[in-house]
């Protein structure tokens, strides 16, 4: 009984969020641009619109730092420490992680980038974090330029 109620509430909340996005011409346009990318669905697009309104105004380094997908080094003198990610907007990072898992499977650009990093010997989560950063950079550029997804235009670097 309780699980059914939770599912109904989740469905109702998602429908309300979608209605809010559709009522605003600006958000509707941005959501359509974001959703043109394979692996990006309603959850990520609504999360980015609501929790990261500065997405189209920041450069890639600023975006990565703001979301918390930029590696922070722990070096001291000649000692090379580990690189970790922390801080940033955890809600955006969590949703971006799940979307990147889909993108690695269904988005040819992100998939090729991930496979190249894995072939270089990078651990899976390190490669996935790099893909999160790349996906975020692509989404920011698409909103900034008001262009839909073009797989041939996404340079793999």
Q: What are the roles of these predicted feature ranges?
A:
Residues 1-157:
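A detector of single, family-specific signature residues
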């Amino acid at each position: 009984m309780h699980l059914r109620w939770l599912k109904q509430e989740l469905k109702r909340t998602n429908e309300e969020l979608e209605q809010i996005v559709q009522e605003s011409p600006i958000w509707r346009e941005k959501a359509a641009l974001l959703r043109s990318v394979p692996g990006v669905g309603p959850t990520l697009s609504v999360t980015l619109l609501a929790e990261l309104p500065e997405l189209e105004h920041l450069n890639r380094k600023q975006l990565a730092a703001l979301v918390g997908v930029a590696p922070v080094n722990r070096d001291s003198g000649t000692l090379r420490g580990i690189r970790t990610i922390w801080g940033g907007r955890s809600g955006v990072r969590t949703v971006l992680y799940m979307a990147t898992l889909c993108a690695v499977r269904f988005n040819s650009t992100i998939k090729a980038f991930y496979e190249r990093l894995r072939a270089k010997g990078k651990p899976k989560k390190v490669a996935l974090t790099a893909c999160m950063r790349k996906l975020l950079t692509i989404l920011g550029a698409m909103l900034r330029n008001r262009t839909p997804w073009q797989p041939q235009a996404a340079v793999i670097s």
